[in-house]
Amino acid sequence: MEDREEIWIVMKKRVITGMLISLILCTMTACAGGKTNNGTEEGIGMESNEGMIAKAIAQETNQEHVSVDAIPEKYTKKRTDEAGTIVHISYPSKDYFLDGKAITKEANVYLPYGYSEDCKYNVLYLMHGIGGDEAEWGMVDDDSLVKRMMDNLIYYKEITPFIVVTPNGRSTENCAREGSDFNSFYVFGKELRNDLIPYIEANYSTYADADNMSLAREHRAMAGLSMGGMQTINIGIGECIDLFSYFGAFSAAPTSNPAEKTAQLLKDSPYEIAYFYNICGTEDEIAYDSA
C-alpha cells in the first residue's frame, strides 16, 4: 500500500509539472498583455516570449516519450514574499444528477500575488480524480504544492498571473469522496456552465462578458487528472468548447465518448482548440487506452 501511495504522489507531482509548465504557457491573453497606445488590448502571440516557450514545449511533447524525474527546487519552495492566496468559496448550484433541487457546492480558488480588480485574469478550472474532491489538488493552505509552483512560476516571470479554481466534480448533493455516485461526474457540465463559471466571473476580475460567455473562451482553460481528465474531454471539449480554448487531460479515465465522436464534435464545431495537452504513462493500464 505504501508503494502505491508513493507512486501516486510521484505521478501527481509529474502531472502538476506538466500542467503548470506546458498547459498554461500558451497564448492566452493575460493582464501582462496590457494595452496598446490606441487603447486596444494587446494579446500574447506566438512571436512573444511566452508564445515561443509554448511552441517549443509543444514540439518537445510531440515526441514519443517525455520524462520528468523531479520538479526543480526553485518551483517548489514556499514563498514568503510574493505569495498568492487561496480562498474557499461556496456557491449556489443544483443537484443535476438527481432531482434538480437547489444545493450549495464548494471550491477553492487561487488568486495570484498582487491580485487586483483593476486587472483582468485568465482562469484555469482544475478537476480532481474519482476519489477526490475540491481539496485533492492540495489547494487548502500555504503548503499547497500547486500554490507554491504557481507563486514561483509567477515570481520568476515564466507565466503571467492567472486564477486557478478547483471544484468538486460531482454535480449532486452527496458529493463526498466516499459513498457518492460516480455517474454524477458526467453531468458536471451543467453546473460548470450554469453555476460555477458565472459565480467566478461575477466575483473575480476576469475577461467575462455577462451577455456572452463564449467571448471570453480564449481566457479559460480546463484540465484534470484521471476522472477529471475524462471530464475535460467529455465535458470541456464535448459540451463546453464554446466556453474554453485550452485543455489538459492527465491520465484521463476512459471516457463515454469514443475518439471518433470527439473528433466529429470538433469537426462540426465552429470553435477551435487553441491548445490540448494530453499525457499518460505508458504503464498506466487503465488510462493509456483512453489517451
Functional labels for PLM-detected ranges:
Residues 32-34:
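Bacterial signal peptide processing site
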Residues 1, 36-37:
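A subset of signal/propeptide-processing and intrinsically disordered low-complexity segments
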Residues 1-2, 291:
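Accessible peptide chain termini
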Residues 2-14, 20:
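Positively charged n-region of N-terminal signal peptides that target proteins for export
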Residues 27-30:
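C-terminal motif of bacterial Sec signal peptides marking the signal peptidase cleavage site
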Residues 37-291:
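Non-catalytic cap/lid and distal C-terminal segments of serine-dependent acyl enzymes
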